[in-house]
Amino acid sequence: MEKNLPDIFFFPNCVNVFSYKYSQDEFSNMSKTERDSFSLAVFPVIKHRWHNAHVVKHKGIYKVSTEARGKKVSPPSLGKPAHINLTAKQYIYSEHTISFECYSFLKCITNTEINSFDEYILRGLLEAGNSLQIFSNSVGKRTDTIGVLGNKYPFSKIPLASLTPKAQREIFSAWISHRPVVLTGGTGVGKTSQVPKLLLWFNYLFGGFSTLDKITDFHERPVILSLPRIALVRLHSNTILKSLGFKVLDGSPISLRYGSIPEELINKQPKKYGIVFSTHKLSLTKLFSYGTLIIDEVHEHDQIGDIIIAVARKHHTKIDSMFLMTATLEDDRERLKVFLPNPAFIHIPGDTLFKISEVFIHNKINPSSRMAYIEEEKRNLVTAIQMYTPPDGSSGIVFVASVAQCHEYKSYLEKRLPYDMYIIHGKVLDIDEILEKVYSSPNVSIIISTPYLESSVTIHNVTHIYDMGRVFVPAPFGGSQQFISKSMRDQRKGRVGRVNPGTYVYFYDLSYMKSIQRIDSEFLHNYILYANKFNLTLPEDLFIIPTNLDILWRTKEYIDSFDISTETWNKLLSNYYMKMIEYAKLYVLSPILAEELDNFERTGELTSIVREAILSLNLRIKILNFKHKDDDTYIHFCKILFGVYNGTNATIYYHRPLTGYINIISDTIFVPVDNN
């Protein structure tokens, strides 16, 4: 469906687009093309103003029940009006008088084509649209947006590239085409903060109709923004809530969905047309109950995120529109061209609001000499922070690969630099308290972080990035450090330049960068289970296909050996984390055990019942040998004795030397089995 967005339906960015009410005199002076733009108002008016409305007679004049109170009456017969009263906004017949809006209400019946609307209908749609506050203009003021979506406060002023009229037109055309859309743009153009808001607006106006060429029944469904982490759900929902002029969730168009969500973050009066911010796992549980699907941070290749893309592509007729958003397509463009049916690619040009300077610090050691490379890197980091120092009251972010390195680098820097040092990563619980200290401190703050800070939290006073250029890629029973991809570099660099000019200092040779095929270092059981649930054909229906298909088929055989029905697996997928697939054997045993095991997965509280139940699974690892790493750590070289990876090697760190065997409790907890 090719359809352009008329100017009068632009979302108010409060820079060069404002909420506006048009007068009948303005309509009289418009060209035919401008007048015809009002025909599209029939769709939001039918949904939000005329739904369940009827004709009343108010002071002798026929009106819609949404205009005035009055007794329900039979509608009058309508021919061409004898007179038009622009001031009273009424059509006058010899026998009766009818409001502009009531005339349109009676004329706009199912299957009427909108290009057949005459001036009389359009004038009524203008009045109904004014009452809904759905129109916009290039003149106005912020306060005119109060009440547009039931908001008590005005919309935020947004100068970002994604809300310019040009971008709004392009995004609307892609959205209404029902083609899958791949949207890119530099960090800072407003992809995550503004595009979902824009799609919410389009959904409010036109969502649920099968066509915008004629009046049809509608099926209203919300928009969903699917995100890889709870921190992102909370961050982006709060940003958009405030920018739409709301201070509380209840009654707003914003809802949140994630596991163990607190009561105060539940919208008890959600809007049918609204937007749901959800973690990927919960998005999958009700994927087809949403009209527009937005998947953000596609470049991260979160496992469940990639599965959502595969499911949505397989069942694209069940979703009105799908948007994949990513900072860069460096690694995925060719795959998306082949994988998605007739995709539309949109790039929002633009950069961060402020200039970002780049500085390269060369490490003279080859990365293959790992320990020497890191020692040189730490020395270089101290020198770089001394040379390129954030101003007082500002902060810098040091990107390292792992939580362990956060502590290692913090300890090293504290001994050599006089600045406030903090650690932030996904397992830190008091991030808000840390940020309060960072924002209130008159000193320089240095924050050491994992890739978590690439997107999960926005730090408003950061001016410098110090990027080691590495990431820890988890793998079954282990993992390894790798150099980052270009998309990760872009994300890290884009943490500055949003509020003030920024500096990006990097400590790695650009030739070391490479794309990361995460699926090749993941447990694959979710791909099997969701493929069964959504009738995916493996491996061709997967967005990213594993390099080693043998592991995929071994995983399928292992899951089949559990002798759990597809129906039961689907219930387990919807209700439990199952961080280890073997937990499924326990979840099906009894409701009491399932409840305690679920609590362990959510909170980490390990009861004796859960401990003994997991130990009964005999998830055993054999210790081959060990070596001393430092004062309180020993590295153990082991062999896996269960599951898909039976017979493969693993490395485990422990505070004392172990021999014999250990039993796995979780991905981070194990129990030594002495003399066995």
UniProtKB/Swiss-Prot annotation:
Protein induction: Expressed both early and late in the viral replicative cycle.
Chain span(s) of sequence motif DEXH box: 296-299
SUPFAM superfamilies in the cross-refs: P-loop containing nucleoside triphosphate hydrolases
Enzyme class: hydrolase
Chemical reaction(s) catalysed: ATP + H2O = ADP + phosphate + H(+)
Record-annotated Helicase C-terminal domain positions: 366-535
Keywords in alphabetical order: ATP-binding, Early protein, Helicase, Hydrolase, Late protein, Nucleotide-binding, Transcription, Virion
Main location: virion
Molecular function in Gene Ontology: ATP binding; ATP hydrolysis activity; RNA binding; RNA helicase activity
Domain Helicase ATP-binding: residue ranges: 172-347
EC number, UniProt record: 3.6.4.13
Family annotation (Gene3D superfamilies): P-loop containing nucleotide triphosphate hydrolases
Protein origin, superkingdom: Viruses
Binding site for ATP: G185, G186, T187, G188, V189, G190, K191, T192
GO cellular component: virion component
PROSITE patterns assigned: DEAH_ATP_HELICASE (PS00690), HELICASE_ATP_BIND_1 (PS51192), HELICASE_CTER (PS51194)
Localization, UniProt: Virion
Family, as annotated: Belongs to the DEAD box helicase family. DEAH subfamily.
PANTHER family for this protein: ATP-DEPENDENT RNA HELICASE, ATP-DEPENDENT RNA HELICASE DHX37-RELATED
Subunit: Monomer.
Main function: NTP-dependent helicase that catalyzes unidirectional unwinding of 3'tailed duplex RNAs and plays an important role during transcription of early mRNAs, presumably by preventing R-loop formation behind the elongating RNA polymerase. Might also play a role in the export of newly synthesized mRNA chains out of the core into the cytoplasm. Required for replication and propagation of viral particles.
Protein's UniProt name: RNA helicase NPH-II
